[in-house]
């Protein structure tokens, strides 16, 4: 059930076609979870600053049932900052990513939970 959310001040017109699909496939590979359970939400055109400037930046979160922790999070940060840099031209030092290890009983899907 990984869910990746990107809030960014990058304009919608600068988000390349296929970017969400690419994030989905890369996260599936990185987490080892099926792409069918991965949700990606990119929210462009946000009023944001980072380090006091409105240069391109992103505030992100990755929620997952398991697969969250020290070494894994460093790998995700490298992957996701790389994609945000390559595709949206956001410098990695202008990205924060918060990681959330979700309890399966606290994640609803398809009329039930993952527990």
Swiss-Prot record:
Its main location: secreted. InterPro entries: Macrophage_inhib_fac, Macrophage_inhib_fac_CS, Tautomerase/MIF_sf. One of its GO terms (biological process) is positive regulation of cell population proliferation. It is found in: Secreted; Cytoplasm. GO terms for cellular component: cell surface; cytoplasm; extracellular region; extracellular space; plasma membrane. Keywords: Acetylation, Cytokine, Cytoplasm, Immunity, Inflammatory response, Innate immunity, Isomerase, Secreted. The modification N6-succinyllysine is found at residue 78. PROSITE patterns: MIF. Substrate binds at residues 33, 65, 98. GO terms for molecular function: chemoattractant activity; cytokine activity; cytokine receptor binding; dopachrome isomerase activity; identical protein binding; phenylpyruvate tautomerase activity; protease binding; protein-containing complex binding. Expressed in a wide variety of organs including brain, spleen, liver, muscle and kidney. The keyword DNA repair does not apply. The keyword Lyase does not apply. Its EC number is 5.3.2.1, 5.3.3.12. Belongs to the MIF family. Pro-inflammatory cytokine involved in the innate immune response to bacterial pathogens. The expression of MIF at sites of inflammation suggests a role as mediator in regulating the function of macrophages in host defense. Counteracts the anti-inflammatory activity of glucocorticoids. Has phenylpyruvate tautomerase and dopachrome tautomerase activity (in vitro), but the physiological substrate is not known. It is not clear whether the tautomerase activity has any physiological relevance, and whether it is important for cytokine activity. This is Macrophage migration inhibitory factor. It comes from Rattus norvegicus (Rat).
